[in-house]
Amino acid sequence: MRLHFRGVVLPEGEVRDLWVRDGVLTGEPIREADTIATAGWILPGLVDAHCHVGIKHGGGHEDRAGAVAQAEVERDAGALLLRDAGSPIDTRFLDDRDDLPRIIRAGRHIARPKRYIRELGIEVDDERELPDIVAEQARRGDGWVKLVGDWIDRSIGDLAPLWSDAALQAAIDAAHREGARVTAHVFGEDALPGLLDAGIDCIEHGTGLTDDTITRMAAHGTALVPTLINIDTFPGIADGASKFPAYAAHMRDLHRRSRDTVARAHEAGVPIYTGTDAGGSIRHGRIADEIIALTEAGFSPHHALAAGSWQARGWLGHRGIEPGAPADFVVYDEDPRTNLATLSNPACVVLRGRVHLRRSPVTVHR
């Protein structure tokens, strides 16, 4: 398939011609190419760096058809690269479909008994087994492992760490020996120091970050995926936790200061990327909402786009719009740098050189 696009290519902001042959961007014009767009704004494929293909909205496991439908929704929203931050089902069969987003898997959540959502993760009775389980998930994943760093401990009625510092050190070392990076679900404050001491590569949510842990993350290049649209569910979680008033108050407080927390991390230089936490309480296809939410935390539109597109792609080892790269990009009628809401309405999605959601070609720049 030979395709031609012309438009303002981001992030450079230059009007260029893009040529696609056999799913790959080329640096030279292609004769007899099918011109798809003669104007518009062209953005490297968006990234949902924290989602869960295979978890039903509202809870439970998806079947194969449901997992396909979730991936299709992500694609149509322009999210062409997904980091699946823990799924209870094997979604490798999706890799056989060239019309679905590329997925980077982190295996299954690793937690303790009664310290995470039932039936979603692997439950470790004895934390001395954690390094071996982490190594196994590293081999099954695509270069990532997902730990549950904290969760409510009903015996104390509030968030608390799941693992000792020694167990974390051994587990993260085991993952690194397998060539995998490690990320961890963390809502509160107390689990963060041990994870950072152990060399964790990424923190999910991070609502409990303090000035000290932010400084440490920035110094070590530890990434943050704040999942702001998921954090907005915290008040509802608190409302349903009347048996645990300290936990409920804690969750409300974490939500109240969440935008400020992310803003301080951004100002300190912590690498921040977009993730929706789709699957479970958040529906798939909301990457535009998460990018917009970053502007509520002090991001400029340019930096919010970077966190949800080209910088996130580079962090995950995928290329942007350049010769020799896979043709994974999105075309918009309006400039997303001046109106991020346009991200919710792509004119054309191109994945592996195939066109999806094509509307009438844009013929003017605005």
Task: Locate the predicted segments by residue.
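N-terminal metal-binding scaffold of metallo-dependent hydrolase/deaminase domains
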Residues: 1-31, 37, 41-43, 334-340, ...
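Active-site core of metal-dependent hydrolases
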Residues: 155-260, 267-268, 273, 278-281, ...
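C-terminal cap of metal-dependent C-N hydrolases
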Residues: 308-311, 323-366
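Hydrophobic faces of well-ordered beta-strands that scaffold small-molecule active sites
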Residues: 45-51, 82-84, 103-107, 145-147, ...
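Histidine/acidic-residue-rich, glycine-tolerant segments that coordinate divalent metal ions
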Residues: 86-194, 198, 202, 209
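Metal-associated gating/positioning segment near the N- to mid-region
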Residues: 41-98, 114-121, 198
